[in-house]
């Protein structure tokens, strides 16, 4: 695979290899055949980051080869959304001959939605001033004249200039209901929107008929907690990143959801609060004991669950675990399988043509 060519003819074979690999990894814990969710074969990534290479009068996007570290020129990127591809061409055309915008520009980040909105961030090794803002506004207006619904941001050391806003609003059809998700620049969002829809619908399916409340750790912008709210009496969710919490609060209001409570704290801190080890001012006014959480949802970072959180989640009758790293999932399952068994197993092909796998398991108490 090269950045400008996807081996789409190999899609089925690479997916089949992942299924075999996941089954092999899960064999000590389950003999289930994974439910398999396929990605679009191209234009599936909704965000991308590129370094910018200056070559005389020319400049262009590059990425670095992971093995050789050599740079690779990228003029089109079929893994990314069609909107990102349009913007890549338009941004280079708009910046190449503009001394103010191109000087010391070293990176461009793209974030797009299925609803055809975009935030483009230009990163600089220089101070950004009013002259930069004026030129950036002219570029933004020229892009919009090409029917590109785009917001531009300039970034430099300790500086962030938003010309309009630093977010876009995604609209996803999830099990017959449109969900609105505010996505903030430089915050985590699911990279493959089509796969995200399938993950949300799978999570809804496996929690059908749930009793009581849901507790979610690492909730981000509320991606899962808001979609799952319809299956539970109440949802209590934690997240540490301030921009994600603010986006989650917006998303609760935008989706007219009244049974979700977001708390800004780390999963480790919340574990201490639940176990009565520490009290936190942030929890004043929230009666943790009033929640009857029969199900806990975790979507941890690549490192998986720490040992304290492992112990905490074992107290819940049902554990829904979305993993972006099956190796750490299996490490967690060495502990979790002592008290719980795997009821459902899914493979989500979030990153086609790479070795990365995303998977989901539903665990129920033995």
Swiss-Prot record:
Changing residue 358 to Q: Loss of catalytic activity. The active site is at 324 (nucleophile), 358 (proton acceptor). It is an enzyme of class 2 (transferase). The record marks 190, 299, 302 as: Interaction with RNA. Keywords: Methyltransferase, S-adenosyl-L-methionine, Transferase, tRNA processing. GO terms for biological process: tRNA folding; tRNA methylation. Disruption phenotype: Cells lacking this gene exhibit a lack of m5U modification in tmRNA. The keyword Transcription does not apply. The keyword Membrane does not apply. Pfam families: tRNA_U5-meth_tr. InterPro entries: MeTrfase_TrmA_AS, MeTrfase_TrmA_CS, SAM-dependent_MTases_sf, TrmA_MeTrfase, U5_MeTrfase_fam. S-adenosyl-L-methionine binds at residues 190, 218, 223, 239, 299. Its EC number is 2.1.1.-, 2.1.1.35. One of its GO terms (cellular component) is cytosol. GO terms for molecular function: rRNA binding; tRNA (uracil(54)-C5)-methyltransferase activity, S-adenosyl methionine-dependent; tRNA binding. Induction: Growth rate-dependent regulation of transcription. Is a novel example of a mRNA regulated through a mechanism similar to that of a stable RNA (rRNA). It comes from the Bacteria. It catalyses: uridine(54) in tRNA + S-adenosyl-L-methionine = 5-methyluridine(54) in tRNA + S-adenosyl-L-homocysteine + H(+); uridine(341) in tmRNA + S-adenosyl-L-methionine = 5-methyluridine(341) in tmRNA + S-adenosyl-L-homocysteine + H(+). Belongs to the class I-like SAM-binding methyltransferase superfamily. RNA M5U methyltransferase family. TrmA subfamily. Dual-specificity methyltransferase that catalyzes the formation of 5-methyluridine at position 54 (m5U54) in all tRNAs, and that of position 341 (m5U341) in tmRNA (transfer-mRNA). This is tRNA/tmRNA (uracil-C(5))-methyltransferase. The gene is trmA.
């Amino acid at each position: 695979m090269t950045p400008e060519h996807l081996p789409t003819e190999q899609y089925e074979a690479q997916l089949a290899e992942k299924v075999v690999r996941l089954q092999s990894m899960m064999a000590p814990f389950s003999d289930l055949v994974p439910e398999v969710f396929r990605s679009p074969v191209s234009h599936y990534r909704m965000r991308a980051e590129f370094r910018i290479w200056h070559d005389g009068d020319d400049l262009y996007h590059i990425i670095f080869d992971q093995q050789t570290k050599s740079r690779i020129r990228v003029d089109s990127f079929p893994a990314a959304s069609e909107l990102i591809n349009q913007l890549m061409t338009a941004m280079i055309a708009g910046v190449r001959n503009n001394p103010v915008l191109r000087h010391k520009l070293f990176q461009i980040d793209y974030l797009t939605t299925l609803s055809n909105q975009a935030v483009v961030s230009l990163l600089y090794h220089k101070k950004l001033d009013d002259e930069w803002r004026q030129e950036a506004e002219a570029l933004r207006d020229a892009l919009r004249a090409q029917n590109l619904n785009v917001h531009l941001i300039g970034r430099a050391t300790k500086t962030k200039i938003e010309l309009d806003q630093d977010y876009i609003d995604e609209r996803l059809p999830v099990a017959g209901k449109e969900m609105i998700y505010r996505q903030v620049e430089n915050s985590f969002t699911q990279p493959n929107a089509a796969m995200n829809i399938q993950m949300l619908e799978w999570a809804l399916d496996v929690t059908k008929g749930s009793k009581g409340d849901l507790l979610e750790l690492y909730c981000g912008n509320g991606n899962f907690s808001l979609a799952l709210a319809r299956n539970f009496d109440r949802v209590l969710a934690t997240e540490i990143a301030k921009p994600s919490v603010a986006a989650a609060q917006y998303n609760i209001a935008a989706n007219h959801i009244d049974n979700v409570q977001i708390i800004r704290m780390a999963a480790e801190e919340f574990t201490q609060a639940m176990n009565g080890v520490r009290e936190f001012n942030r929890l004043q006014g929230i009666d943790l004991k009033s929640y009857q959480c029969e199900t806990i949802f975790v979507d941890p970072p690549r490192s998986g669950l720490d040992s304290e959180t492992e112990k905490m989640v074992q107290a819940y009758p049902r554990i829904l675990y979305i993993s972006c790293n099956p190796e750490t999932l299996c490490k967690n399952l060495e502990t979790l399988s002592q008290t719980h068994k795997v009821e459902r197993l899914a493979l989500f092909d979030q990153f086609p043509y790479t070795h990365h796998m995303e998977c989901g398991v539903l665990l129920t108490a033995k």
